[in-house]
């Protein structure tokens, strides 16, 4: 139970990063919604002005989420807490995973600001990871398919 609470907390911190950037940029947004087995989302109530603004919002989540993971790491090392160290691993993993340049993932939105072809590269990377057996998670397969549809 404590690990589950920590996971929800780290996901909340990640989403709060998006919300803080939206507040700073004057973008209205909806309350956070948890999506079972996937994570959470905060929807923008207006489209970003341009791809760079979308990329800034996308980058806010992994930045604050990674800081949350660092806090868990520091706390885990200082207190020798296996729980905090495990949560740090989870935090690093979800933020790194979220930076894959695929479709609706944060990395896909950031890469899309750099080049319209970045989504194709992300799909190639994701497909290669699946083909090589590096990722065997059915939820990732769904994300990859949705990214292909979106690209």
Regions found by a protein language model. Name each.
Residues 1-151:
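Hydrophobic transmembrane alpha-helices and their immediate loop junctions
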């Amino acid at each position: 139970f404590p690990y589950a609470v920590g996971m929800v907390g780290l996901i909340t911190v990640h989403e709060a990063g998006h919300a803080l950037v939206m507040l700073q940029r004057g973008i209205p947004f909806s309350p956070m919604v948890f999506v079972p087995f996937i994570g959470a989302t905060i929807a923008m109530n207006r489209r970003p002005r341009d791809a760079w603004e979308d990329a800034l919002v996308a980058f806010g989540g992994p930045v604050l989420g990674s800081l949350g993971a660092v806090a868990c790491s520091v706390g885990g090392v200082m207190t020798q807490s296996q729980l905090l160290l495990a949560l740090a691993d989870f935090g690093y993993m979800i933020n790194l995973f979220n930076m894959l340049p695929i479709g609706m993932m944060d990395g896909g939105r950031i890469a899309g600001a750099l080049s319209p072809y970045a989504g194709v590269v992300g799909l190639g990377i994701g497909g290669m990871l699946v083909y090589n057996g590096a990722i065997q998670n059915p939820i990732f397969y769904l994300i990859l398919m949705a990214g292909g549809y979106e690209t």
